[in-house]
């Protein structure tokens, strides 16, 4: 009996030890799993504080981390701001793709965001891509985006040989276009974007007529700010062949200015007898207000113009995006409908869209009355930062 009791006791101890080992394995597994989220949340706090006007929070974040190292150098032939974290690399890299702003990489908000990413432990590159500081986007802009991404991924201080593409507005669209390029396969860890467009034809329709068509053909009214019309017009005129017509129309738009409440009024009232056929068709589209005429006017554009426009539309090509895509937008963005983000599922199976009232296009607005909106945006940032470090 004593031997049996001893055997039972021994078996009981073995069972308890086995249970302890299983429990320990579960705890360790959960710790490893959740630690990456805790780590990403801490980094998200650093990044978000860089774009919020919260002096106490910003001062605490700056005191907790080392001072980033800022430098300027050309990247793939484009002037760029490069911000490195304190300490030794390599680091996970972020290519911050700007929208259309005259100040480009020198805009204080852009520099603050780049420094926030660097304080959070990321190598950040912010180039001035062709056209963006002049309020236009062209195939040359898209090509330069791809070239910069390739060069950043190959930097010796880039961890894992991959770069995360983080874009705002048209910059987010450029990031998506680059991620479609087969030349960058295996060189991108993530695309994270705020308020992109996916189909420039839809954007043209909204900018000129205030409407767009859903996939089922229904016309939807969508009100946007006048600046969209200005950028769309400058980009469309830039597709014309170099010559007098392009110079004339670009000068007329430039005279109206980016702050004009009616940037297309001059084109809508001008005669077109002095213009060639291609320029006439461009003015005809930009001057039109009737959404039912849009399709015919778009079809009348020169073949070269429509080809250039398709090169600026992620949904127009046959490429696929194989990396995770995190997108965030407001419920009614002042430029691009949320449907522009949702539609990307066709080319980006790992696409996730966050809609939050904390975003007013590229601006983060936070109020005590709607902390849930900030929490939703925070979750978007946490997921993005965690994925960007997955190879670290």
Where are the predicted features?
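N-terminal cap/lid segment of alpha/beta-hydrolase-fold proteins
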Residues: 40-89
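Short, surface-exposed "cap/lid" segments of acyl-processing enzymes
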Residues: 86-117, 128-129
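Catalytic nucleophile-loop/oxyanion-hole region of alpha/beta-hydrolase
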Residues: 105-113, 126-164, 179-182
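Gly/Ala-rich beta-loop-alpha elbow adjacent to hydrolase catalytic centers
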Residues: 167-175
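Alpha/beta-hydrolase-fold enzymes
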Residues: 177-274
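Short beta-strand/loop motif that positions the catalytic acidic residue
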Residues: 321, 327-329, 333
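Conserved alpha/beta-hydrolase "acid-adjacent" motif
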Residues: 334-340
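Catalytic active-site module of serine/aspartate enzymes centered on a nucleophile-bearing elbow/loop
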Residues: 367-392
